[in-house]
């Protein structure tokens, strides 16, 4: 699809405009909507990972406010509509489990679930053949007994590896580790991973940091800002501050990687950078990509991508406050596999 500027927009962004993800049947931790991804230039004006548009007038702000009000009203209406928990229709899921594919992967996700798109990104980067089933929470498909047998937590994402006797894996971090380790075992190439135990430990550390500290804090900040039944300013402030703290950790790590890279590559100016007589930002290597672990992209980096594009809705401008995080995310957002996954293709 196309946005008003004629740029392509992902299926994820389209779904987030239409689907309320704050209702009690939702099993994502995002609790917000109206997030647009634009390609290939990056992320659109609703996101913090974007090019600044200082000429924007009040119309855009009013549209954003109206969008939030509409989403909150949807939340209220759907809570009413689903007070009757007998409203469950999951024949589509039952049929799938009766006729499962013989090979490849099946990803269970939701069109507004960042963690589901996190898995899709890695599947796409590794070149694995997979099919995505976007569950309909309104029909209660996530409560289908067959799906609960795959994920006892009845949440997304979940993955079935049909090449391993329909092995089911749940929790996004566990899924990513399964995929990169399987690829490494089958090909001998540690793509998005490492053959070095020390690097593997660091990748695991950042991955666990993302799944336990980054995503949940953003989800809570969004919940208390837009969907909690009472306005609790201290909760909004507490979770927003924690998100900033988390991004500060990532920013510092990337900045250290940036300094090391520039000093290694720009040897003719290294002394001037060390002495402080020339800003390191003037180096021709200053915008080169840097990664959290080693000198290549891994799942430690990619796990952050879908979540990095919602933080503007809690009042955090990544480009201004965390410039290294901004550049890092833009480098990943330009990758064809990431674009494909975020479009839901």
From Swiss-Prot:
Keywords of the record, alphabetical order, are: Nitrate assimilation
Q: Where is the composition biased (Polar residues)?
A: 22-36
**Domain GST C-terminal stretches:** 196-345
Supply one GO BP term. regulation of nitrogen utilization
Annotated region (Disordered) at 22-66
MF-aspect GO terms: transcription corepressor activity
Domain named GST N-terminal is located at 103-187
- Per the record, where are the segments of Low complexity compositional bias? 41-66
What role does it play?
Plays an important role in the cellular response to the nitrogen source. URE2 gene plays a major part in the repression of GLN1 and GDH2 genes by glutamine, and is required for the inactivation of glutamine synthetase. URE2 gene product may catalytically inactivate GLN3 in response to an increase in the intracellular concentration of glutamine.
Family, according to the entry, reads as follows: Belongs to the GST superfamily.
Q: How does it assemble?
A: Homodimer.
Protein name, UniProt field: Protein URE2
What is the organism field in this record? Saccharomyces bayanus
| Gene from which this protein is expressed | URE2
